[in-house]
Amino acid sequence: MKFFIDTAEIEEIRQANLRGWVDGVTTNPSLIAKSGKDFHTVIKEICKEITGPVSAEVISLQHEEMVREGKELAKLASNVVVKIPMCEDGMIAVKKLKSEGIKTNVTLVFSPMQALLAAKAGATMVSPFVGRLDDIGVEGMQMVDQVIQMYRNYDFETEVLVASVRSPMHIQLAAEMGADIATIPFKVMQSMTHHPLTDKGIKMFMDDWNKAQKK
């Protein structure tokens, strides 16, 4: 299973990469806006930090403009994946970009049918948003399981990238289901290293060691 980090912060990417946790990066306009930097500058900086896929999102909702923006983004670095919102124009853009050898990540997917359409259009990756579904009382991970099963039934090459991750349990379930990728905020990655018994055990070992040194 591949881990992507969901951030536009260079230092978070560096720290996660230092720990061996990062296979790629996902960004969106909101994350980049928080950085206060130029959009293309941020994407270039990220692509210098990591060799894996870096998802960069188009802003337009018209397919001609999506394709134009996608081509511009793809020129920034060889590992850029163009992020396209799930909509009819988006599917036209995905098909066109695929025909030109440009990889795509269809985002804002909230149903198995949307994921199926994205795969039919030729998306490289599809991003089901689990946390936002959970927020409205729908079990997000159940949708992921359905998407994975459908893709396996028909041997789609589109990778399932679990997004809108809120907790380590989302990652565990994604791994159990066989999702290809999960994109994870750095804080959630850090929380995955902890367990009350691990923390307690480390403290006990250190206390015992310090006592022994005083004898």
From Swiss-Prot:
<dbReference type="GO" id="GO:0005975">
    <property type="term" value="P:carbohydrate metabolic process"/>
</dbReference>
<keyword id="KW-0570">Pentose shunt</keyword>
<dbReference type="InterPro" id="IPR033919">
    <property type="entry name" value="TSA/FSA_arc/bac"/>
</dbReference>
<dbReference type="InterPro" id="IPR004731">
    <property type="entry name" value="Transaldolase_3B/F6P_aldolase"/>
</dbReference>
<dbReference type="InterPro" id="IPR018225">
    <property type="entry name" value="Transaldolase_AS"/>
</dbReference>
<dbReference type="GO" id="GO:0016832">
    <property type="term" value="F:aldehyde-lyase activity"/>
</dbReference>
<dbReference type="GO" id="GO:0006098">
    <property type="term" value="P:pentose-phosphate shunt"/>
</dbReference>
<dbReference type="Pfam" id="PF00923">
    <property type="entry name" value="TAL_FSA"/>
</dbReference>
<dbReference type="InterPro" id="IPR022999">
    <property type="entry name" value="Transaldolase_3B"/>
</dbReference>
<keyword id="KW-0963">Cytoplasm</keyword>
<comment type="pathway">
    <text>Carbohydrate degradation; pentose phosphate pathway; D-glyceraldehyde 3-phosphate and beta-D-fructose 6-phosphate from D-ribose 5-phosphate and D-xylulose 5-phosphate (non-oxidative stage): step 2/3.</text>
</comment>
<comment type="function">
    <text>Transaldolase is important for the balance of metabolites in the pentose-phosphate pathway.</text>
</comment>
<dbReference type="GO" id="GO:0005737">
    <property type="term" value="C:cytoplasm"/>
</dbReference>
<dbReference type="InterPro" id="IPR001585">
    <property type="entry name" value="TAL/FSA"/>
</dbReference>
<keyword id="KW-0808">Transferase</keyword>
<comment type="similarity">
    <text>Belongs to the transaldolase family. Type 3B subfamily.</text>
</comment>
<dbReference type="InterPro" id="IPR013785">
    <property type="entry name" value="Aldolase_TIM"/>
</dbReference>
<feature type="active site" description="Schiff-base intermediate with substrate">
    <location>
        <position position="83"/>
    </location>
</feature>
<keyword id="KW-0704">Schiff base</keyword>
<dbReference type="GO" id="GO:0004801">
    <property type="term" value="F:transaldolase activity"/>
</dbReference>
<protein>
    <recommendedName>
        <fullName>Probable transaldolase</fullName>
        <ecNumber>2.2.1.2</ecNumber>
    </recommendedName>
</protein>
